[in-house]
């Protein structure tokens, strides 16, 4: 049985970095959850053992299920039926395995149904999933949209939506439009407030990854007459309420298991997140900063898969009576690939640890005033 965690010793090297002790102790608030949840760690060693065991489960699922389904998923892909996305059979099996293993909402607090993982081991899981199937990582990795709900939504919204994500419901970030790709301040999806104070949105979004998800974060124009980013707000759309249909799925060159959708909104009911006008300049910026780590993990995971494929081929392919890996030119290519892979992974986890420190202190600051040395560490 393949295990994409245990067969890659470099992952454990990064998991046991000395900085993790500080991160874990802060994240666990000196292990205050130990008396409240039977699966909460008692101390640092217990926490690290928990991360290690969960990553072993991720590695096993990736090696035995997700990687085995990857070719079929990429060949068949999802389809649209009656305005809804139907995942490929392999994708359904992948999601089912992750749900049963409790691998959704990994970084969310235990009180909301999550595992309370720091960002670093969560990104490590994303690295492993990406090696198995980068397309599935696009779906599974969107669970980190819950971070935005946790950071900026009301307590009522947190309690309403985050437990659903932790239970296995999927998410998407509905940002781009036909005339607003990289230039998000040009977004024109219209958000209208009704007399009773509720909101509805109307318009079209395009290139939305996993666009038929259960819970959407939607960027829309809430301020009549505005034309720039200061007129945009963020909303939550719940698929259960209806009002959004999938017009089509884009025919991409790769990662076809991930449905990239065009969405049509017709009086779709939504909930405002945080404050009006802050959708792009604050909430989306925070959302995309987290997404960048996920995409970096996806790139590293893909690089790992490519390197292993190249190495296996070089050992198997024979010319002039010997394996081509024995030719200095080929060996040099492989050595350079490995060096770049190791450097990329090192940079990824160094960044993840700093993000952990920033986010944890940001969360602590909601509970109490940070000490001067803590503010310095956060920076």
Regions found by a protein language model. Name each.
Residues 1-136, 156, 160, 360-377:
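Amphipathic, small/basic residue-rich leader segments at the start of a protein or domain
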Residues 36-39, 240-243, 247, 259-291, ...:
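A glycine-rich, basic-preceded beta-loop-alpha segment at the flavin cofactor/substrate interface
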Residues 76-86, 109-115, 143-152, 175-180, ...:
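Conserved short loop/turn motifs at secondary-structure junctions
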Residues 81-108, 172-196, 200, 206-215, ...:
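Flexible, glycine/threonine-enriched loop-and-boundary segments that flank and lead into catalytic domains
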Residues 141-142, 153-189, 352, 360-375:
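Internal maturation/activation junctions in enzymes
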Residues 179-182, 207-209, 226, 252-259:
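Short Gly/Pro-enriched turn/cap motifs at secondary-structure boundaries
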Residues 198, 202-244:
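A short core secondary-structure module
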Residues 292-373:
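Extended amphipathic alpha-helical segments enriched in small hydrophobics
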């Amino acid at each position: 049985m393949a295990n994409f965690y245990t067969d890659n010793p470099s992952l454990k090297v990064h998991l046991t970095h000395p900085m993790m002790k500080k991160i874990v102790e802060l994240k666990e608030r000196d292990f205050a959850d130990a008396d409240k949840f039977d699966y909460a760690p008692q101390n640092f060693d217990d926490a690290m053992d928990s991360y290690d065991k969960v990553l072993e489960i991720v590695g096993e699922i990736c090696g035995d299920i997700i990687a085995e389904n990857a070719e079929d998923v990429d060949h068949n892909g999802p389809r649209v039926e009656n305005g809804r996305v139907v995942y490929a059979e392999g994708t359904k099996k992948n999601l089912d395995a992750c749900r049963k293993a409790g691998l959704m909402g990994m970084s969310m607090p235990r009180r909301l149904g999550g595992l309370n993982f720091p960002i670093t081991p969560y990104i490590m899981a994303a690295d492993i999933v990406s090696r198995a199937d980068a397309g599935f990582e696009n779906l599974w990795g969107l669970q980190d949209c819950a971070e935005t709900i946790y950071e900026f939504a009301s307590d009522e919204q947190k309690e309403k939506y985050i437990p659903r994500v932790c239970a296995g419901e999927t998410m998407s970030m509905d940002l781009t439009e036909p005339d607003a790709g990289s230039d998000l301040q040009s977004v024109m999806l219209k958000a209208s407030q009704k007399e009773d104070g509720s909101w509805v949105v109307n318009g079209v979004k395009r290139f939305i990854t996993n666009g038929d998800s259960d819970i959407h974060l939607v960027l829309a124009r809430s301020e009549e007459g505005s034309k720039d980013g200061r007129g945009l707000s963020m909303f939550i759309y719940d698929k259960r309420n209806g009002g959004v249909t999938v017009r089509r799925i884009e025919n991409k060159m790769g990662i076809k298991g991930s449905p990239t959708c065009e969405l049509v909104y017709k009086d779709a009911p939504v909930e405002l997140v945080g404050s009006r006008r802050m959708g792009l300049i604050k909430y989306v910026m925070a959302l995309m900063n987290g997404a960048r780590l996920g995409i970096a993990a996806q790139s590293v995971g893909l690089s790992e898969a490519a390197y292993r494929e190249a190495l296996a081929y070089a050992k198997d392919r024979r010319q002039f009576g010997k394996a081509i890996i024995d030719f200095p030119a080929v060996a040099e290519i492989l050595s350079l690939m490995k060096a770049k892979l190791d450097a990329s992974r090192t940079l990824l986890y160094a960044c993840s640890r700093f993000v952990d420190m920033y986010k944890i202190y940001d969360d602590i600051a909601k509970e109490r005033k940070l000490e001067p040395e803590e503010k310095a560490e956060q920076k």
